[in-house]
């Protein structure tokens, strides 16, 4: 008996039933918002821009389907100096306002780098607030010896800039003494107690790093990202420019990478360290500087790195984001290369 044909008919009927029993819903594509469109970085070479060409470019971008631009001023084109506009000057702010107005007309968003080139810095950053590095120098003394020596930075380039942060004395018996107060006018006058003493001087120096690829008007020192005062000074210049020229903040501000070379200190680090970690780093400078890895040296260096990470997150990333929010803007960060937990740093801004 052949049952295959009957079986086929049964499957066919069952299939028709399933198709007709399942309701068919019409699917419509959701409304496309500005956020769904791609955006582009917009290099302003030398900020040599004018209203006519800004409008032409923005209309071209809009026709291509772009939903926003990110303005990044950078160094200019050789031979075009006469058309360059200084960053944050009244004329530059007029160009930004024109861009905002045209973007609004075209349904696009205006974003900008909160600086020129990278990393953040410029003429508003004094040497006091520039990126900082530690220098350690050592001296020796025997018990009963009176030391009357100059405590100066050996590097001649730093001699007029660097300053003494701490001078600590460590004996072979385990004694630790802060003798910073014994230094007057860069000269130490101190008589060593019994024992053999190792003196470690900690100086704060500057890296002298300049903003890379800076646009006209943006040249200057890279700021101390660990210093709340330095970061406040930096964004205060932006706040003043936007306020005085009556230009609203853009949709977002961007940080075009960290890339701060050699900056491993900040003037308040020792006081911040004891407040956060519960002990004084200066009392453990021999262990901190010891190249041999032990449980103690590893823990101290870990605490040091954790302190730097917290200062970067709180004094730079969070302060920057709070500043942007006060002006109705949001932040976007390129945190890679930062001395901190990258996930924490990205989580501190609005757009990772």
Task: Please state what every model-predicted region is.
Residues 28-32, 37, 46-49, 53-55, ...:
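Mature extracytoplasmic enzyme cores
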């Amino acid at each position: 008996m052949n049952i295959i044909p009957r079986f086929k008919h049964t499957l066919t009927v069952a299939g028709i039933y399933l198709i007709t029993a399942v309701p068919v819903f019409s699917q419509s594509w959701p409304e496309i918002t500005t956020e769904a469109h791609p955006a582009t970085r917009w290099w302003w070479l030398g900020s040599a821009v004018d209203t006519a060409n800004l409008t032409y470019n923005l209309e071209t971008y809009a026709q291509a389907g772009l939903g926003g631009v990110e303005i990044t001023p950078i160094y200019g084109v050789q031979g075009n100096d006469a058309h360059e506009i200084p960053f944050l000057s009244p004329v530059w702010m007029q160009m930004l306002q024109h861009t905002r107005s045209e973007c609004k007309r075209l349904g696009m968003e205006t974003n900008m780098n909160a600086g020129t080139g990278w990393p953040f810095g410029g003429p508003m950053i004094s040497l006091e607030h520039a990126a900082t590095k530690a220098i350690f120098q050592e001296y020796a003394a025997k018990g009963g010896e009176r030391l009357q020596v100059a405590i100066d930075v050996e590097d001649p380039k730093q001699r007029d800039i660097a300053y003494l942060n701490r001078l600590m004395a460590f004996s072979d018996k385990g004694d630790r003494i802060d003798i910073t107060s014994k230094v007057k006018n860069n000269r130490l006058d101190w008589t060593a107690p019994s024992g053999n003493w190792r003196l470690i001087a900690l100086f704060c120096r500057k890296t002298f790093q300049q903003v890379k690829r800076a646009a006209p008007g943006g040249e200057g020192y890279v700021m101390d990202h660990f210093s709340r005062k330095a970061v406040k000074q930096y964004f205060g210049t932006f706040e003043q420019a936007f306020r005085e020229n009556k230009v609203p903040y853009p949709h977002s501000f961007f940080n075009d990478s960290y890339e701060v070379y050699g900056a491993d200190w900040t003037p308040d680090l020792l006081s911040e360290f004891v407040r956060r970690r519960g002990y004084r780093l200066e009392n453990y400078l021999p262990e901190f500087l010891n190249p041999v890895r032990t449980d103690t040296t590893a823990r101290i260096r870990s605490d040091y790195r954790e302190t730097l990470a917290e200062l970067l997150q709180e004094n730079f990333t969070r302060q920057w984001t709070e500043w942007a929010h006060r002006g109705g803007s949001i932040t976007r960060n390129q945190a890679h290369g930062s001395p901190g937990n990258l996930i924490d740093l990205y989580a501190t801004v609005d757009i990772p």
